[in-house]
Each structure stands twice: as C-alpha cells, then as structure tokens.
Amino acid sequence: MRLARIVLSVGVSALAVATVVFAFGGSGIELRDADRGAEARGGAEELQEQYDETQDRLEALALARRQGTLGVIERIRRAPAPGWAGERIVNRTGDDWEPAIAADPNDPFVYILHNRFGGEPACPSNCPDPAMILRVSKDGGKTWGAERYLCACRRVHGQHDPLIEVVPQTGEVYAVWMNDFDIHFSKSPDHGKTWSTPVPVYGNVAWGDKPNFATSADGQDVYVLYNGPTGGDVHAAISHDAGDTWEQVRVTNDERYHFAYGTAVLPDGRVVSTQNSFTYSGPASAAEGPVLQHVYSSDDEGKTWSEAVIDTLELGTVCTSELCYADFYDSGPALAADEDGDLVIVYSGASEPEGPRTVYGRSSTDGGRTWSSRVALSPSGVNAAFAAAAGFGDDTIRIYFADQRTGRWNVWYRSSQDLGATWTAAVKISDATSGTAYKNAKGFIEFYGDYGEIAVTDGGKTIAVWGEGPSYLGPGGVWFNRER
C-alpha cells in the first residue's frame, strides 16, 4: 500500500521520539489506551487516511457479497502457455492484495504472504483488518497448506505491505510488514509453523511506510529500507544479529518522496536498494514533474550510503479507476541479484507526461556502481508497469510485468540467461480467461495493489504472484502461476 495522496512533512526530527497523542472523533479511529503510543507515532492524517481507505474497501466488499460478484463466481477457464501450470487464485472468496513470495533455494518450500480485507478475524477482538495471511507449499507450489495468520497482533488497526524472504544458508523464514505505520520483523525456524514475537525495527523514527528488505546469506545481516516522516526521505533499519536488535540510519534529506521496491545483500556484504521518487507539489498534493530511478548502496554495513540516479522518466497515464490516485501505475524499480552478485534492475516510466509507460532493464557487474544502457522489455506505445524480478544461478534473471496491450491488464513473463543482454519472448502468465467478475479473455480490469513478486524454486522453476481486481477499490484477489 503506497501512501501517496496525503504527503506531509511531520514536525519532528527523523530521529526524535513522537510525544503527541492523536485522537480521532466521529467515524474516525477510536484510540485504545494500550495502543496510544503507536497511534501517535503514525501521524494523525496518515492513519486517518489509511483507516478511511480500509472502510471504503470493506464497504465495497460487503456490496460485492450482496451482489454475488465477490471472488470466483463461475468456472475458471485457463489457456496456459507451454511449460506453465496455469493461473490459480489463492483464495476463492478472499479480498486479498499486495502479495509477496519467497522460495527456499535448497528445499521445495514456497511461501506466499498477503493481506486480506474483511476476512475471519485472527483473534476474538481488537484484531487487525486487513490482516496478514501466510500460505506454505512443501512441493514447489503444486499444493498449498491451510491459511495461517502471521501474527494476531491485537490492538493494531491494520497490517500492510507484506514482505517475506528465506535465509539461503539456513532455510529460516523472515517476514517484514507494517502494523499501522509501525514496521515489524518476525522469523520462523520451522517453515512458517511458528513465528517469533514481532520486533519493531523503527527505533525513534516517528513512522515508516513502504518497506523493502533483504538478508545476508547466513541471515545475520538484515536491512529494511523505507520512507519516513520527513517528507518521504529514505531510512534504513539495520540488524546484525538476525533481527533481534535494530539501529536506524537516515539515508536522504531532500525534497522528494521515495519508495523502496528492491533490496539485495551481495556476497561481499554490499547492500543495494532500488527506489523511485516523486515530488507531490501539484494541486491537492498530486505528483508532478519527473520520476527519478535511484540506486542506493552501502559498503559499511549500512552506516553510510551512496546514491546514483540511473534514469529520469515522466509520470505516465493516470489511473482513473475507483479510489485510485493518479500515479498508481508509476510503480517502482525491481531488483534481481544472481549468485555472484551481478544485478538487473527492471523499472517503468513514460517518455512524455501522461503517456504510456515502457518497462526497461539495465544490468550491473560491479555491485550497482555502474549500469548498462537501458533495454526496452515491453511493447512500444502500450502502457506497462508493475515489474518484478528474481535472480538464479549465474547471470539468469526471471521477470514479469503487466501491460494493457489488449485494453485490459495482463501479466507477461520473460527471462534472460546472460544478465539481460538478451531476453526470451514475452509469455502471458495471467492465463485465466474467466472465473471472476473482473476477468475475461482479454485480461483483468485492474492491477490490485502496488506490487507482486516472482521467485525461483529449488528446482529452478519460476513461480509468480500478483493481485487482480475490478478497480483499485476492489474487492480483488491474489493469483499465481508456476512453471511445470
């Protein structure tokens, strides 16, 4: 969930403890005594916006239930591409969005983490809505176990921005998400059966949004990049003891609002984060001006960071679906690292204001210090966005993106075995042609949520996950597809 419609510079230092308690009256948030500290940290207007949007989604969900348009309403017909199993929905009736996925590189475990609006509560009372839902597969995504709540997290209004990774050397599973605007970390030693008590990563930073994270191969070094309370500056939360304790570093101090979409810890310990940034100085705090594509990196365990702007693009075609904000399709740059630490960044943007976006790729063989010329990965003149990327082996990269070449959205897959010098032809993996009110043979109406993800199983097979819906408002669902 990208906070983009209300942009504030909160009147506290990025490293100062918030001491003011905010209260909402009327139909707004009712503060619970035990949770006033967390509410104060989030900022009144941001929390109210998040709460109001959730209420809008719950109303749309209730309406869809009454009208019989929620979830799967007819047989799902598929037309899988060769080598693919066919698109499937994670839950037939859930209002699910913004999924994350991780695959164990040494065992056939795959994990999908997403949040759900209006689902069965995780606890008897004072439970978050939306709440984090975990699904685990023991066979590379062929079959899936029962849904589990990652954390009941009582006295939290809503959980957002799920992230999940597998520690390569141990198989331990790490997760990061937001309780309201408080970013937390938890880990599982037993393939998602049990989870540690969530640990806050934010220290004295007043609130955080849009986290992205990565871990070292042994799981000791964990880096969470996110935007903070000073007008969207970049912050880093850093742990060198497998997530038990955290320190925070402010990375930027500028006039732009940043969003983290990719993070990698390279074999030599270098940390790389890919982000885009906006200025929200237009009417009603709308985005205006160019969109910058950034690479941030650290060679000293997160103490200091360098920045490179690798491209400058324009805000593209505006989103006009219900509840949507104009720059929703201006999604951020995905990052893939292979086993040697070579990198590919995949991002999108328009060449002229409100024009169609193109998805581009660039590669780096020196840890993100320098980058190749950009290569277009999506068709010219067709609006494209929502890239995801994963590395595998030596120089192998798997990506997907979504575009509107049919007049509706579809998800397309491409791969490269030479670090992005050449790419396979695009294959449609959103191949279900029926089943819900928002799907037909041309595709689905709206991408649901800011992002999805792609992963590679221990057998070298690709598995990808994303959200689809009738509008930005929803209700929609999480879908996935996998290579056979």
Predicted regions: what they are:
Residues 1-13:
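N-terminal Sec-pathway targeting helices
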Residues 10, 21, 474-475:
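Cleavable N-terminal signal peptides
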Residues 13-26:
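Hydrophobic alpha-helical membrane-insertion segments, chiefly the h-region
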Residues 26-484:
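Extracellular, repeat-based ectodomains that mediate carbohydrate processing or recognition
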